[in-house]
Design a protein with these regions (language model features):
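C-terminal and inter-domain tail/linker signature
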Residues: 27-311
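Bacterial N-terminal signal peptides
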Residues: 11-20
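Bacterial N-terminal signal peptides that target proteins for export
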Residues: 1-12
Length: 311
C-alpha cells in the first residue's frame, strides 16, 4: 500500500525532471545556434578564392545567384578585379573570419612575377560574405602605389598577434569589441578626445607597410599623435564585420573622408583591424589606396548587432 501510494508521485517527479531538462536544452539551442559555416568552412572558402585569384580561374568559387562584386569601388563581374589575370604570387597573407556574421576578410600583397623583382606589386584587400556556404558579396581593394616610399614588397610575414587566443580573463564581449573600434573612429573623426579611448601601452599601428607611430618620421604614440589637429578624417560607413571574442580581434571597412578644414587629407576606403586585449587597443593594421583615386564605397551601412541574452 505504501509503495502503491508513492508510485504516482515518483512518476510525476520524473516527468518534471525530464521536462525541465528538455526546456533547458531547447533554450540552449535557441541561445547558441550553430552557424551554417564555421571557422574552418569560412577559411576553406577563402583559400579557394585566393587560389582562384592566383590561377585566374573562378570555376571553384561557389557564387550565389545574387553575387555582387566591387573592385576599388566599381561594380565588376567575378574575376574581373584589378589584380585578376596579373597576380601570380601572394607573399603576405592575413586572414580573418567570423562565423556569427559569415564574414571573411583578408589583407595581403600580390605581385605579377615569381621573383622579388616583380614589375608590379599591390596591397590587396578582400571581403567576402558567405551565406549557406555560397559567396554573396565580394569587395576587393588593390593599390600598386607606395606610402612614404614603402612598396608592398616590404611586407613578408603577417603579425601572428592577431591569431593568438586570449585568456578568458583578457577577453571582452562582442559588443565591447565593436564599441572600442567605434571609439577609435570617433577619435579619428574628432568627435572624441583621444584620452577617452582605451589605449594599450604597447599600441602600434601599421598602414600600407609603414609603422606610422613611435617612429622618427612620426614620433607620436597611437594616442599622442592626435595632439596634431591635422590628423583628422570623418569616418563614415563604418562596417564592422568581424568581432572575434576569443582572439580579441575586431575588423571593419570604412570611408575615411576629408574634413572641411583639411580638404587635402587623402580620402580613401580602408580595411582596418584591431587587436583588443584587456579591453585596450594593442595593435592596429590598415590597408587602403594611398592616393585620391579610390571611389567612395557604395556598400550599405550595417544594422547594429543585437547582443545575445546575457552578453
Amino acid at each position: 500500500m505504501i509503495c502503491r501510494s508513492y508510485r504516482p508521485i515518483a512518476w510525476l517527479g520524473l516527468c518534471l525532471v525530464l521536462c525541465g531538462l528538455g526546456a533547458r536544452g531547447a533554450e540552449a539551442a535557441r541561445a547558441a545556434p550553430e552557424p551554417d559555416c564555421n571557422r574552418r568552412c569560412l577559411l576553406q572558402i577563402l583559400q579557394i578564392y585566393t587560389e582562384g585569384l592566383l590561377d585566374n580561374n573562378t570555376s571553384r568559387i561557389k557564387a550565389a545567384a545574387t553575387l555582387r562584386v566591387t573592385s576599388n569601388g566599381s561594380d565588376v563581374p567575378l574575376g574581373k578585379g584589378e589584380v585578376w589575370g596579373s597576380a601570380k604570387r601572394m607573399p603576405y597573407r592575413q586572414a580573418f573570419v567570423d562565423p556569427v556574421t559569415g564574414a571573411v576578410m583578408f589583407m595581403g600583397t600580390v605581385t605579377n612575377a615569381p621573383t622579388n623583382q616583380g614589375e608590379r606589386w599591390w596591397f590587396y584587400m578582400v571581403r567576402l560574405k558567405v551565406v549557406a556556404k555560397q559567396v554573396t558579396e565580394v569587395e576587393e581593394i588593390s593599390y600598386d602605389g607606395m606610402l612614404r616610399g614603402n612598396s608592398p614588397s616590404k611586407l613578408t610575414q603577417a603579425d601572428r598577434i592577431y591569431d593568438a587566443v586570449l585568456p578568458v580573463s583578457e577577453q571582452v564581449s562582442r559588443a565591447e569589441l565593436i564599441a572600442t573600434a567605434n571609439k577609435y573612429f570617433d577619435v579619428v573623426s574628432g568627435t572624441l578626445d583621444y584620452h577617452e579611448a582605451p589605449w594599450h601601452p604597447e599600441c602600434s599601428r601599421l598602414e600600407d607597410a609603414v609603422l606610422t607611430v613611435n617612429q622618427p618620421e612620426s614620433a607620436g604614440s597611437c594616442a599622442g599623435e592626435f595632439e596634431n589637429p591635422r590628423l583628422k578624417w570623418i569616418v563614415k560607413n563604418r562596417r564592422i564585420y568581424i568581432a572575434d571574442v576569443e582572439r580579441g580581434v575586431v575588423m571593419a571597412v570604412s570611408n575615411f573622408t576629408s574634413p572641411p578644414e583639411y580638404p587635402n587629407n587623402n580620402a580613401s576606403v580602408a580595411f582596418e583591424v584591431f587587436k583588443i586585449q584587456d579591453g585596450l587597443i594593442r595593435h592596429i593594421e590598415a590597408m587602403f589606396r594611398g592616393d585620391s583615386s579610390m571611389k567612395v564605397s557604395t556598400w550599405p551601412d550595417l544594422p547594429p548587432e543585437t547582443p545575445p541574452k546575457g552578453d
